[in-house]
Amino acid sequence: MSDFLITESTLEKTPVTASNIRVRKSFAKNKQVIDIPNLIELQKSSYEAFIQKDMDPDRRGDAGLNGVFKSVFPITDFNNTASLEFVSYTLEPAKYDVDECRQRGMTFAAPIKVTLRLIVFDVDEETEARSIRDVKEQEVYLGEIPLMTANGSFIINGTERVVVSQLHRSPGVFFDHDGGKNNASGKLIYSARVIPYRGSWLDAEFDQKDLIHVRIDRRRKFPVTILLKALGYNSEQLLEYFYDLDEVYVKGGKLFRKLDIERMSGQRALTDIVDPKTGEALVKAGRRITRAIVKKIKDLDITELDVLPEDLEGKVLAKPLIDESTGEIIADANAELNAAIIKRSIEAGIESFFMIFFDGLTVGPYLRNTLLVDKVSNKEESLVEIYKRLRPGEPPTLEAATTFFGRLFFDPETYDLSEVGRIKINHRFGISMDECPPSHRTLTHKDILSTIKTLIDLKNGRGVIDDIDHLGNRRVRSVGELLENQYRIGLVRMERAIRERMSLQDVETMMPHDLVNAKPVNAVVKEFFGSSQLSQFMDQTNPLSEITHKRRLSALGPGGLTRDRAGFEVRDVHPTHYGRICPIETPEGPNIGLIASLATYARINNYGFIETPYRKVEAGQVSKDINYLSALEEAGHHIAPAARDEAGNKAIQTATTITRRDGEYEIVDKDKVALMDVSPSQLVSIAASLIPFLEHDDANRALMGSNMQRQAVPLLRSRAPLVGTGVERLVARDSGTSIVAQNDGIVEEVDASRIVIRRFAKGGELGANVDIYNLTKYQRTNQNTCFNQKPIVTVGDKISKGDIIADGPSTELGELALGQNILVAFTPWQGYNFEDSILISERLLKDDVYTSIHIEEFECVARDTKLGKEEITRDIANVGEEALKDLDSSGIIRIGAEVRPGFILVGKVTPKGETQLSPEEKLLRAIFGEKAGDVRDTSLRAPSGVYGTVIDAQVYSREGADRDERLSLIIEEKKRKLEKDLAVEQNVIKNNAISKLRDILVGKITTGVLLNEDGSQKLLNKGQEITEADLETVPFELLNYIPLEQDLEFQVNKIIDNARNQLDAVKLVFNEKIDRLRKGDELPPGVIKMVKVYVAIKRKMQVGDKFAGRHGNKGVVSKVLPAEDMPYLADGTPVDMVLNPLGVPSRMNIGQILEVHLGWAAHNLGKQLGAHLEKWNAENARTEMKDIFSDSDISAKLDKADDASLKSMVQRMKHGIHVGTPVFDGARESDVKGLLAKAQVPSSGKSVLFDGRTGEPFTNPVTVGIMYMLKLHHLVEEKIHARSIGPYSLVSQQPLGGKAQFGGQRLGEMEVWAIEAYGAAYSLQEFLTVKSDDVAGRTRMYESIVKGENILEPGLPESFNVLVKELQSLALNVELMESDILRDQDEDFGDEEVIEVEPVAPVASKDEPEQH
């Protein structure tokens, strides 16, 4: 067996014939080396590391939430007289469980309590020594922190959300150049940037004149030497650090220069270099010194050369020249030598000159020139200068400047490189971990000097710049880290408030809780979950979309990129993405490449870098060791692809092999190979690895295919694909939509809403060995699809841990099942497949193949208004009994009622404003009581387009409010369900205890008599041998009163006590839930009662729905054709879908054709197997199945299977055997042909098709087969709506747009041209006036329609008035005047309106044109 098609471990425990297991024939050639890790581990482990919920406070360390508290505390007041210290924190259990939070619109969160210690000191005024006066410790409530559900999501205000991991630039140092863009000559401008995790950025860059400048936090730049001098270095030290020195010394009145042999190669000789023995010139002055000459000089042991004084002119001094007799400085460091200085120095008896070496070729004078520009001379001036630049307007004092500079880069409170940043800097500059450990998280002087030195080296042509898209320079911030940062922001805000409180009030009388206000922390966390760009509404269309959402990596978000600024390089696929980020799955459109998905086997290490697994290879031998490596760690290694090896060899079989190394492909000897991929599919993400034959699809289409699988709607009857890849099982397991058995056991009880499994005892372990799994029934998801679980086990089934026992939405037998296996034909049909349209058989509609259930939630809230309370009631004025027929006495619609648009779901009345009543009305009201006139009907009605059935209604009311009948019923129902759960749990606990007692007691002798509770009856006699029947007569309560020998009695008591403890615990949980039901609900302020009504809508497939395959082949249904008119096969089977063959060649997604062929073979093999059912012969069936599966493991299992289970297995396979063809390791063309031959169909995969209308065969054979087609969430019913009249925009008075606003269709410029082209003038006038924004005309039109007249009287469109107003706002006084002059001239003109424009602007001069 191979590649995650039922793993062997599953098979060992569970027979292949089990009803809840699907066996796939695998085409994989590679044995699976390593299991795919849990798919949502990324989210769960990150959050666990942050919250450390169940960890002992002492062992929490400096990570996560504990680290945040430790970094902010202790907080001292301004005078150092008090200190508030952090001791530990505890998380209490969440108040509501996940389901309750979903229903009530609450946040699933745990209250957090922090133990703080307040220490008050006495300060001696003279010595300023502190002594502790008082210590107070107290637990302080710090609000709530949202908890992650078992599936890796959060529930915030009742909706499920996911925090997406962010891909951002790793902290550290980066070197780059501008690519020559900023200079006409293409000269490269180099720059360096030190990015901390938090704190000020430091940029160093060259300018056009080759001087080095720095910026702090992208402010104004200043020469780098000012920064270096502020660190305490002077010019002399800087020149010595950045340059090699040349020494020239005076000896016997002559000048000699020391030779630096290592540096001479490639230089020009200043003077002739002569062989001292022969006097022969080795190289003439001005000539270049080659390597050969350098070797000669070495051999001849020449160490010095004589120089003339004029040779020194123009050289730059590294150290000052000082006349020792007078102490006078002849020339300072960095001064240029000239004849006068040289002469004077020699006269003053200076013995040696130190000069800096630069030749303008391999070493440039950049730092020396920068020193000349910089005007400051010492550390103090530098500090003040930097302070002035960064804090303009503040008085620069030395003290302030020193503190400010220290806090910029060297104070752990304000500057944090993080461990990652420190490791990256050490790695870049070759600093050892001993010299600077990861715990040193601020900059050092050496870091800054190394940065400048490396920058200068780059400019001099040594070293390479960094690639910022390399995954060694990008890291992932997961949930835990994002939340940690938010919590830190909140705590820092809180810290300020605490400091102020400490100084304002008397600390001695205060307790820690008086100082702490948790609001800022809670506000920050709430804002992060509610409105951060990375906290997203979970995509819950189907299990795959959930999993993909949790595994998503986004480069957007706070501290990341923005869509507009991101270039092509960032979005592109990088060689380091291999096995870490999927190159295929990314959205189309503006986010392409910015949002990616984690590859199948990838994981994220402690530093946030993505790692991928490799097998170790030594001397061509592949070992079992698996190494997870990050992009930096794999650099320089030769990595071989996973060999396609059927024999399972442990060594590479060829002498040379193709390998990857640093993004390049090389063919090398097998001995050089260091690593090997673990699986061919480690390259792609989960969604892409669900596409069979992905290797035959063009990347663009594969991208669409993996994206469209996420939009597939869960169908009424899910069917797993005949042609899968084997990953289907994993998605179903890890998404949390299916139910996975937690322990081995036997199924005790199954119904639609719960499964009870009795656990096997492990090593005689005591305890209530029972697992109760409650199934979710018809729950609404975020995308309004239906979440429903159904059991796939029966009573008595043996279950192994990890087995799937209930299917969720879009899963079948524990495998992901997004669509249906459909018989398709590729042929044109009457133009109905034009532009990717799909022709569909009516059979799919009749059999509900593509019917899905969608659940809409409607909410009605009764508030307490200023005019009085709103009321939810059945008693609504002016509404007929017909409209109220489905409402119960409380005014809420009954469950099971059919709903259409406009139906009342919840009756509600709202008080109207009090009107002045006439005396007569007052009298009538006094006589006849309240009139219904003071309330208006504000009932919740079903919106347009909703045709469905009410499946649930939930009522929530405040504590103390009167309970209506419906609420009481709901509470009773919930109570009954809880009691039933309790009874089941208690029964199983008792039965379990009894079964253990049975093992101990049967056959043992009693030592006394046992009476029943009231003593009226003997249950057991003295000296009686206990039988199973005897035990059944003893009530559970009396079991530990059976008189026995002492050690037996001890064992019995232990079992009974254990059972009682468990019964008590279960009862306690039950009581808590019952209390909560009785209490009433937490509702937002001002809300008295809230009703939620859930309506299930059945959406059948229809024309206009969007369908897609898994290869990016999408289309829209163009016609539903009666089955009898569809093309049919020779045996009379009509096809289900007709697709356009022209959709394949240009799109280059050939995978779909291979899928169709393989599906056709699998389908026909299933039919062949099914034929055995008519004349059942177990041996024949077994032989044929062994032949089909051709896998030794499965064959062995089939041999063991009995006839009945074999028959049920064949029964399940009669519509097709399921095959698995893993990505990049699946069926080859020969395999497909072989299977077609086994299935006895033509190996071309083509069949003769007949026209269903005429019965004539088509001219050519047609490709027919099984394709897996998905119905996507873009349903035409949810998109189309109709409007005659409706809401209008306030300003322009034109109809609104969009379905949500019940808007109209826009008639744009081009549509106007089209109508003009037809000459339909009156229709056009009607469109542009009375149908749109001619307010008066609209009313007149309505009147004339009511009167039955046919008159169109258009007036002035409102948009014209808007235009006039806009012109007036430009100070052009445009007025509309009706002129009588025209009317006098000609009566027939009708009501003409004349516009006169008079400028309000100043009178135009002669030169200017007049303004109108």
Swiss-Prot record:
Top EC group: transferase
Entry GO terms, CC: DNA-directed RNA polymerase complex
InterPro entries the UniProt entry points to: DNA-dir_RNA_pol_bsu_ext_1_sf, DNA-dir_RNA_pol_bsu_external_1, DNA-dir_RNA_pol_su2, DNA-dir_RNAP_su2_dom, DNA-dir_RNAP_su2_hyb_sf, RNA_pol_bsu_bac, RNA_pol_bsu_CS, RNA_pol_bsu_protrusion
Entries under Pfam families matching the protein: RNA_pol_Rpb2_1, RNA_pol_Rpb2_2, RNA_pol_Rpb2_3, RNA_pol_Rpb2_45, RNA_pol_Rpb2_6, RNA_pol_Rpb2_7
GO molecular function list: DNA binding; DNA-directed RNA polymerase activity; ribonucleoside binding
EC number: 2.7.7.6
Keywords: DNA-directed RNA polymerase, Nucleotidyltransferase, Transcription, Transferase
UniProt keyword annotation of Transcription present: yes
Highest taxon of source: Bacteria
PROSITE patterns tied to this protein: RNA_POL_BETA
HAMAP family, alphabetized: RNApol_bact_RpoB
Biological role: DNA-dependent RNA polymerase catalyzes the transcription of DNA into RNA using the four ribonucleoside triphosphates as substrates.
Annotated family: Belongs to the RNA polymerase beta chain family.
UniProt protein name: DNA-directed RNA polymerase subunit beta
Gene field: rpoB
